[in-house]
Amino acid sequence: MELQGKKVLVFGSGKSGIGASDLLAKVGAFPVIYDGNAETDKDAVVHKTDGTYPVTVYAGELPKEVQDSLDLVVLSPGVPTDLPLVKSFYEQGLPVWGEVELAYRVGDGEVLAITGTNGKTTTTALLGKIMQDARESVFVVGNIGIPYTSKALEMKQNSVTVAEISSFQLETIDEFAPKVSAILNITEDHLNRHHTMEEYIRVKELITENQGTEDVCVLNYEDEVLREFGKHLTPRVVYFSSGRKLDEGIYLDGNKIILKDGEKEIEVVKTEDLKLLGKHNFENVMAAVAMAYYDGVSLDSIRKSICEFTAVAHRIEYVTEKKGVVYYNDSKGTNPDAAIKGIQAMNRPTLLIGGGYDKQSGYDEWIEAFDGKVRYLVLIGQTKEKIKEAAEKHGFHDIILCEDLKEAVKVCEEKAQPGDAVLLSPACASWGQFDNYEQRGDMFKEYVRNL
């Protein structure tokens, strides 16, 4: 679609919506911003744009004459596609894109795209480093803080875009076709948005929908859903595994990551040479290595990059050591499966801070994963009673309920002994007490440093 001269509704007035509006104006479209919250400060929204174009903001009610005059709708990732207003756009025959589709249509060059329930941020950052070390023009975008739309105009034919893509963003793609895609894993998450596990899986798998036979899809062999999915794909499928040797693909063999490509069997790296902790991180490394290798980056270059790479902020991030107690920030552990990875990476007795906003997750598997490592479970937020009940059902009773994160950190300091770890790995979203998981992690680090 030629965007110049088109009237486009941008649904959502947050960072993503503003980025989309600015980009649309730059390519000659006429953006209109809409927010479903009638209390939205419309002037404040206008001030958030780059100020180079006139824009009208609607809040609460969208006038029918505005809706009837539209050529295209761009949804922010936070807007569910099953809202009555969004459904009415589809019924009207309007194209409905997300920011990823918009950026893809405007930008040029090849795209390497990563999705999955957990590990996306680390894998994206790692692949970004590998590609930046190997290529001239590389953009790392997505949920990692840089909106795809903000860089789209800079993406030329020789550019490589490494994009972290969430399930929300995949709901609204149309022609988006990565040269190499990866689905790291699929576990229960965001059921408050996608309603069923089947729908969540369907949306995640959309990342491969427009890929051709020359393209590559990297999948986790240890994920049964993905192993089955890989049998029916158009692109070439490359598996990675942390649980077994593969005839083709990349796998963990003891302390070595091995790449098997046809007759070639190559040791990529020893795990002790990496600065990342835990089996889940070795899976992230394997996914990034496979994506870069099948995009033509040499193994020597890949090896150098992955050995230099350090952990992403808020993902089992070492904070400090005080009085023999090590503090880790895993605020990115926003669901039980991610938090399981956090506790599995601990190699000392642990005081675990959990709880937060309720995403309708179940906590049984997380509590089973404590595996004798957790000395105290210190709970905060909306879910604290629900998690306490689940823990007690599993026979775990060393539980302390706190009002907020500051109190939880103080309690951990009082209870911890030299040789222990204190781990913030909430298994829940941050909303309610914090704006986002980054703010929660930053506050944790500040409280720890002030002990």
Tell me the role of every PLM-derived stretch.
Residues 45-51, 364-420:
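C-terminal helical cap/extension that packs against the catalytic core
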Residues 155-243, 251-253, 258, 269-276, ...:
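Flexible active-site lid/hinge loop adjacent to a nucleotide/diphosphate
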Residues 24, 73, 114, 143, ...:
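Residue-level signal for inorganic ion chemistry
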Residues 1-98, 102:
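N-terminal leader/targeting and accessory segments in enzymes
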Residues 99-141:
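Walker A (P-loop) phosphate-binding motif
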Residues 31-37, 217-221, 353-354, 373-382:
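Short internal beta-strands
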Residues 60-61, 97-101, 234-252, 305-307, ...:
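Beta-strand->loop->alpha-helix junctions that form or flank phosphate-binding loops
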Residues 2-7, 17-27, 271-374:
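Nucleotide phosphate-binding/pyrophosphate-handling subdomain across enzymes
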